[in-house]
A protein has these predicted regions:
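Active-site-adjacent betaalpha module
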Residues: 1-8, 17-18, 35, 44-52, ...
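Short hydrophobic beta-strand that contains or immediately precedes a catalytic carboxylate
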Residues: 10-12
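Acidic/histidine-rich helix-loop elements
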Residues: 19-35
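Polybasic, low-complexity intrinsically disordered tails and interdomain linkers
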Residues: 27, 48-50, 56
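Glycine-rich loop(s) and the adjacent beta-strand/alpha-helix scaffold that form part
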Residues: 38-39
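Short beta-strand segments at enzyme active-site cores
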Residues: 54-61, 171
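Acidic carboxylate-rich catalytic motifs and surrounding loops in phosphoryl-/glycosyl-chemistry enzymes
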Residues: 60-62, 121-122
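Short catalytic/ligand-binding loop motif for oxyanion handling, primarily in non-cytosolic enzymes
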Residues: 64-68
Length: 186
């Protein structure tokens, strides 16, 4: 049985960009989101975590104007930066309501003082943010993982967290992916 002291829920990229029709990545994820009922299941998962007193961590995706100046980029980074996906004008300004970088409305009721939103990751895992630090400082050794995209950020987070010694459980109906093949591959 899980306990609230060492188990946490980690959600990757629960943002408009992939989860809502106004997002630039939604066209690629729409079919899987509908098939597995991702948004509803993600919302239920967060409601359960909050109700039972588990810590919740959000590992979002963000890009800023200074990211355009990188000396090299992976193909996925190039595509996201050129299309201004998960875009924020500055790390010092608020995220525009409803923008691709904004969290979806369905999960906002669960983003409270007991939710830790870690620094944004770039591509694709938590190596470039403070998720590991936050989990360790909170005494977490087991992660229940969900979010977007199953074959990219969820998979990379899972692999890195396992390498770091965490027990990881992926909730396969609370993830989405850019197509059925990508969903099945993950």
């Amino acid at each position: 049985m899980f306990n609230q002291k060492n188990v946490a829920f980690v959600i990757t990229d629960p943002q408009v960009e992939f989860l809502k029709s106004t997002g630039k990545g939604f066209g690629a994820t729409k079919d899987v989101l509908e098939k597995v009922n991702t948004i509803e299941n993600l919302t239920k998962l967060l409601a359960l975590a909050k109700e039972r007193g588990y810590k919740r961590f959000i590992s979002p995706h963000y890009f800023y104007p200074h990211d355009h100046k990188w000396q090299f980029k992976a193909a996925g980074e190039t595509m996201m930066i050129e299309n201004e996906m998960f875009w924020r004008d500055s790390q010092y300004s608020a995220i525009p309501e409803g923008s691709g970088a904004d969290m979806i409305e369905e999960i906002k009721p669960f983003l409270d003082e007991d939710t830790i939103v870690v620094n944004g990751h770039k591509i694709f895992g938590p190596e470039s943010n403070d998720l590991n630090l936050q989990l360790r400082k909170n005494g977490i050794d087991t992660v229940i993982l969900a979010g977007m995209n199953a074959n990219l950020c969820v998979d990379s987070h899972m692999r890195e967290l396992i390498e770091l010694g965490y027990n990881v459980i992926v909730v396969n109906d609370a993830v989405g992916a850019p197509g059925e093949e990508a969903y099945q591959a993950a």
